[in-house]
Amino acid sequence: MAKDEKKAALEAALKKIEKNFGKGAVMRMGEKVDTQISTVPSGSLALDAALGVGGYPRGRIVEIYGPESSGKTTVALHAVAEVQKRGGTAAYIDAENAMDPAYAEALGVDIDQLILSQPNTGEEGLQIADTLISSGAIDIVVVDSVAALVPRAEIEGEMGDSHVGLQARLMSQALRKLSGTIAKTKTIAIFINQIREKVGVMFGNPETTPGGRALKFYSTIRLEVRRAEQIKQSTNVIGNRVKIKVVKNKVAPPFKVAEVDIMYGQGISQSGELLDMAADQDIVDKAGAWYSYHGEKIGQGRENAKKYLEEHPDVSEDIQTQVRKGLRNRC
């Protein structure tokens, strides 16, 4: 076949594919206009930096997992709040029936506009998620949690019945169907997951996540959330220092770690991570216990310096602008 004939045959094939499957079903990479990854901030400056692209990528699946009470739901709710701030629509599939509206509101979530579902079975929850995502009107959907997506057969069965691999098959089937729709509609899908321990593991990490391997494969980003230490004010515990490790990242280099303060009743402390990142970039000077900015002392000890930034939003905004500029220069 001559070169011109090949070219004509290819053009005819491309037109046929577009006619059958719609515009954009196939394209040359050089023709694709939107090569930049569109993202939504995570609500944490440190996590945005660790993710490498400034937030969660649209049209991708994100898994957030970790031990109990480590801050997984808090991290997900901050993402919901950020989407809503930008005029987006958010849905929350509360399979655990543990949603706290007052706490979500404290984190900046507009609960009046939040679409909430508390499904009875795993199939119901995933079908609701599929319907919402397929509509193209949802910007972010959070499933809390994968472990609570119990298959219908298990709910309708008797206690003690064996249902080996049932949940894994359910997740595998659902993700095969959802992944394409999520990419097409540019929806951010966040799956919160718990941790289980494998029985009889003598060597290596005994920890695993429920729901089989499908979610690990389909996820663009996997975040491991763990408590590092308690934050105390005098003798009272007022929050936790949390480490968020990017264990998988298909859009930037993985294995980066973000350390954030999650304060009880308030969520991620923006001032705490801003102070740490500003000190790391030498925007804020740290000498001993004292923090200073432009030669002026802003606090003795980290908590006092955080308080200063919270009470002086103009200074905080100025520092944040410089920190973001520094992060862009690093990239």
Curated annotation (Swiss-Prot):
InterPro entries per the UniProt record, alphabetical: AAA+_ATPase, DNA_recomb/repair_RecA, DNA_recomb/repair_RecA_CS, P-loop_NTPase, RecA-like_C, RecA-like_N, RecA_ATP-bd, RecA_C_sf
Subcellular location: Cytoplasm
Keywords from the named record: ATP-binding, Cytoplasm, DNA damage, DNA recombination, DNA repair, DNA-binding, Nucleotide-binding, SOS response
Residues engaged in binding ATP: 66-73
Entries under PROSITE patterns matching the protein: RECA_1 (PS00321), RECA_2 (PS50162), RECA_3 (PS50163)
GO molecular function: ATP binding; ATP hydrolysis activity; ATP-dependent DNA damage sensor activity; damaged DNA binding; single-stranded DNA binding
Transmembrane segments: none
Name of a matching Pfam family: RecA_C
GO cellular component: cytosol
Highest taxon listed in the record's lineage: Bacteria
Keyword Mitochondrion: no
Similarity-based family: Belongs to the RecA family.
HAMAP family: RecA
Role noted for this protein: Can catalyze the hydrolysis of ATP in the presence of single-stranded DNA, the ATP-dependent uptake of single-stranded DNA by duplex DNA, and the ATP-dependent hybridization of homologous single-stranded DNAs. It interacts with LexA causing its activation and leading to its autocatalytic cleavage.
Protein name according to UniProt: Protein RecA
